[in-house]
């Protein structure tokens, strides 16, 4: 009986430690996948890269990271659903960003940028986030 009572705190500690590790590991994998896709897309010479997209990064400074990811996913979704361009890569980015955001949002279309500039800025943000992960 004494052995069981001594094991309980150890098991709880292991459970907490592994859940933190798994959470951080998922963050790494998702960000790596996003960055890899962004590297692939931004290296392409494709006319789709000149399409205009809502500039969600021109949002106010008090916008949360989750809101930014949600708006970026929404803007990408608009591109690949309305244009037959880079659908496989953009839908994958949409899925990964939506997973990081875990919310729904709307996008203000008043400011625009090219898809290339949008993806370059998103890549910079993701690399900064990855360096902190």
Swiss-Prot record:
Signal peptide region: 1-24
One Pfam family recorded for the sequence: IL4
Annotated compartments: Secreted
Coiled coil segments of this chain: none
Any GO MF annotation of the entry: growth factor activity
Bilayer-crossing regions: none
Disulphide-bonded residues: 27-133, 48-85, 70-105
Family from the record: Belongs to the IL-4/IL-13 family.
Free-text function comment from the UniProt entry: Participates in at least several B-cell activation processes as well as of other cell types. It is a costimulator of DNA-synthesis. It induces the expression of class II MHC molecules on resting B-cells. It enhances both secretion and cell surface expression of IgE and IgG1. It also regulates the expression of the low affinity Fc receptor for IgE (CD23) on both lymphocytes and monocytes. Positively regulates IL31RA expression in macrophages. Stimulates autophagy in dendritic cells by interfering with mTORC1 signaling and through the induction of RUFY4.
Name under which the protein is recorded: Interleukin-4
Species per Swiss-Prot/TrEMBL record: Lama glama (Llama)
Name of the coding gene: IL4
